[in-house]
Design a protein with these regions (language model features):
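A non-catalytic alpha/beta surface segment that caps or lines the substrate-entry region
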Residues: 1-11
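Envelope-exposed proteins and targeting segments
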Residues: 2, 14, 68-71
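Active-site-proximal beta-strand/loop segments in catalytic clefts of secreted hydrolases
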Residues: 8-10, 19-23, 57-58, 73-78, ...
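Short, conserved acidic/polar surface loops in the N-terminal third of protein domains
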Residues: 17, 28-31, 83-85
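Glycine/charged-rich beta-loop-alpha catalytic/anionic-binding loops adjacent to active sites
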Residues: 29-40
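Acidic/histidine-rich catalytic neighborhood of metal-dependent amide-processing enzymes
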Residues: 38-136, 144, 161
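Active-site-adjacent substrate-binding region
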Residues: 110, 117-218
Length: 218
């Protein structure tokens, strides 16, 4: 397992942390056929959408740097094991990062986890753990999206509580929220299945999320 951290403007004291997981599910456990459940998923949305977003953000930040320090963290092992309960071998990379921060006293102004943001029918509600534990970051992100006319995607209503890579960071005292659309496909029928493929991904959805993510850094 391996995390990767890309740091822009590394000397800046004021920093923003963006993270995404780059691993994909080793088995398609939501498939009906037991044989298919043993096959790894492509993870076009559940992993690769966040990675693609970060590649585009890195390119934009290289061309027009932010005055803020920006940390793009790719974490491994989010989807490796069993979400239970109990949790077994999941969120491994984010848990490691939370215990081994880049420097003593590392406290970014805010952090955002981007997960499953490539769905063609993208609707991102406010994840409950984020609302309860980092409401000021939720307000910052959703206000910026509304200001940009993207309230149709960043929906101003509470969703469900999701166990994801922001939890270990919240537990470590960092203010990190989860930007995620867990409703993937009709009746969530693509999540953790062999249907999580590139034909389900929308360039428009990725651009909307990317525009908001970049605007938060300006």
């Amino acid at each position: 397992l391996r995390n990767s951290l890309a740091r822009f403007n590394p000397q800046a004291a004021e920093r923003v942390l963006y993270l995404t997981h780059w691993d994909t599910r080793p088995g398609a456990d939501n498939e009906v056929n037991p044989a298919d459940q043993l096959r790894p998923i492509d993870g076009a949305n559940d992993a690769a959408s966040g990675v693609g977003l970060f590649v585009a953000l890195a390119d934009a930040l290289q061309k027009k740097p932010s005055s803020l320090g920006v940390d793009l963290l790719f974490v491994d092992g989010e989807d490796y094991g069993d979400f239970g309960p109990p949790l077994v071998d999941v969120m491994l990379g984010s848990t490691y990062f939370a215990a081994h921060l880049p420097e003593p006293g590392y406290r970014p102004l805010f952090g955002v986890l981007f997960d499953m943001i490539g769905d063609a029918d993208l609707r991102i509600p406010q994840e409950i753990n984020s609302v309860q534990r980092a409401p000021e970051v939720v307000q910052r992100v959703w206000s910026k999206a509304a200001e940009m006319g993207r309230g149709d995607v960043f929906v101003p209503r509470e969703g469900q509580a999701i166990t994801d890579d922001h939890i270990p960071l919240l537990d470590a005292g960092l203010k990190v929220i989860d930007v995620i659309d867990l409703d993937y496909g009709p009746g969530n029928s693509y999540h953790h299945t062999l249907q999580d493929t590139m034909d389900k991904i929308s360039a428009r959805s990725l651009k909307i999320v990317g525009d908001v993510a970049l605007a938060l850094l300006r």
